[in-house]
Amino acid sequence: MGALSHLRVLDLSRVLAGPWSGQILADLGADVIKVERPGSGDDTRAWGPPFLKDAQGENTSEAAYYLSANRNKRSVTIDFTQPEGQRLVRELAAKSDVVIENFKVGGLAAYGLDYPSLKAVNPKLVYCSITGFGQTGPYAKRAGYDFMIQGLGGLMSLTGRPDGEEGAGPVKVGVALTDILTGLYSTVAILAALAHRDQAGVGQHIDMALLDVQVACLANQAMNYLTTGNPPRRLGNAHPNIVPYQDFPTADGDFILTVGNDGQFRKFAEVAGQPQWADDPRFATNKLRVANRAELIPLIRQATVFKTTAEWVSQLEAAGVPCGPINDLAQMFQDPQVLARGLAVSMPHALAGAVPQVASPIRLSETPVEYRRAPPLLGEHTEAVLGDVLGLGADAVERLRSSGVL
């Protein structure tokens, strides 16, 4: 039994941030019911190619994007623009612990599915609203996608090559990181609200905004600005506060060197055949190395090209200096540590026979994550959920289906 197997979550969200939170809760054992539009479902079902292939090598209807954020859930199709559909969602909410939604501010009020409406039928409900900009403020009514929030929220000003270098300019992160982090923060907030409910007996509304999360996750870079008034500049792969902490060329590619303290720098200098660097008045401490970055980095680049990536990694690891290769995803999934940790799993799938999944990183000793159910087909569990949760019989379900509610 999962740690959250006593909970039911009604997931009205689409795309990534909300579904990511729902998947985490589902991985931990919660019964997560994904409510989708009849006929089309979650937008990401069509966000391909690539699509999952069947045994004959033909594309199925399941896009890889959708498959990344929806395992261990049950899918029901309900058209809640119709009164009958609204009634069904309200009845499901009355029997749920959590609702997750990511509609525009006020969007669900028109259907009687906003927090005040559902609180009236279930005062213990934890209701998590995820939007681009939050429920308040001048941007509250605006839609917000990860890419635009990375730009507006300052992250892209920190990523990319520095001005003056070839290819200079702001660059977005290679995955929808703001969405994913919002999903993580939403999960933390939901669990906190559930803990409060267990003590106080009442639920609450959670107002999560992609912009808020993005700003919060600027972390040390935000503090670099707030303590100085100077906006941090793009440094490519370099670190604003630690040197050397970036990529360097090797005889056959590149590697990452992450020197975290002066002792590690001394060890690196010895492996590099330049022990004098550790006592050089320009480089002896991290503060000096940051101040003299422009002098030190070219010297390191001149030294690193004489060994292969594997040689650097082997020798520096032996010396206790953190470093590593730069892997593509094929190399990453074949890395012995990734294999040992079981970070790729396979689950039975109705259309393809099996579907690959990235494993949850959560490792609990007493209530481990269980891979119970592949990302569901559209409406795969409609009849079962309406029967199990609401007690509707086959005739009632068929009537709702024939009237276009399901």
Q: Residue locations for each model-derived region?
A:
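Flexible, small-/acidic-enriched active-site or ligand-binding loops
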Residues: 284, 348, 352-399
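A glycine-rich dinucleotide-binding beta-alpha-beta segment and adjacent secondary-structure elements
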Residues: 318-372
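Conserved Rossmann-fold dehydrogenase catalytic segment
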Residues: 135, 165-176, 198-214, 233-240, ...
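Glycine-rich beta-alpha junction loops
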Residues: 39, 133-134, 210-215, 252, ...
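N-terminal helix-loop segment corresponding to the beta1-alpha1 unit
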Residues: 1-189, 193-199, 377, 383-406
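Short, well-structured beta-strand/strand-turn elements
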Residues: 32-35, 317-331, 392-397
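Aromatic-enriched alpha-helical interface/lid elements that frame and gate functional surfaces
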Residues: 241-319, 323
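Oxidoreductase and adenylate-handling cofactor-binding alpha/beta cores
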Residues: 183-203, 216-227, 269-276
